[in-house]
Amino acid sequence: MRGLVSKTGLLAEKATLATVCSVIVCVVMVAGLSLFVEIDWGRFPLWLAALVVGALAFAALGLAIGALTRDVRAASLLAFMLCLPLAFLALVPSGAVAPALYDVIRAVSAVFPFKPALDALDAALNDAGDLGGPLLHLGGLALAFGALGRLSLQRFAAT
């Protein structure tokens, strides 16, 4: 990579752009959903916070995948191969499978932002549980995936 923008700056700009675009789309979707389902707009700051932190975690995951593969087609394929099964794992309720299998599913789901984002949005939209825990979890995942993306760029720059 050459140019006036640092690698970290480029990753931060891409993450910010992806986060802003994602939040705008999600706010429009929730507004459309409110035509059919009652939404408590008094909780708007809470679900906006959940959307922003969740979108940032997903943006960082996308940046890490892109930095690890360095090819657009491979990154897209890897993103779909990873994300579709992981999204289903986030939706598995506790009584649907054996307890040992559910513990494995919880451990795998904790490494990716799907389940924490679902928990954060559920807490923000429906007042269902604690919002702080999922937001901290998503923030940690955003930092971890951002660092992974940055380290991946450094590794490829050396070769």
For each feature predicted by the language model, list its residue ranges.
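Short hydrophobic, aromatic-rich alpha-helical segments embedded in or entering the lipid bilayer
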Residues: 96-135
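Alpha-helical transmembrane segments and their short interhelical loops
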Residues: 7-79, 131-135
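Hydrophobic alpha-helical interface/terminus motif in multipass membrane transporters
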Residues: 32, 36, 65, 69, ...
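Junction motif at the cytosolic side of a transmembrane helix
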Residues: 64, 125-126, 137-159
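Hydrophobic alpha-helical transmembrane segments
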Residues: 1, 19-30, 76-94, 155
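Hydrophobic/aromatic residues in alpha-helical transmembrane segments
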Residues: 28, 60-61, 85, 117, ...
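Transmembrane helix segments
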Residues: 69-111
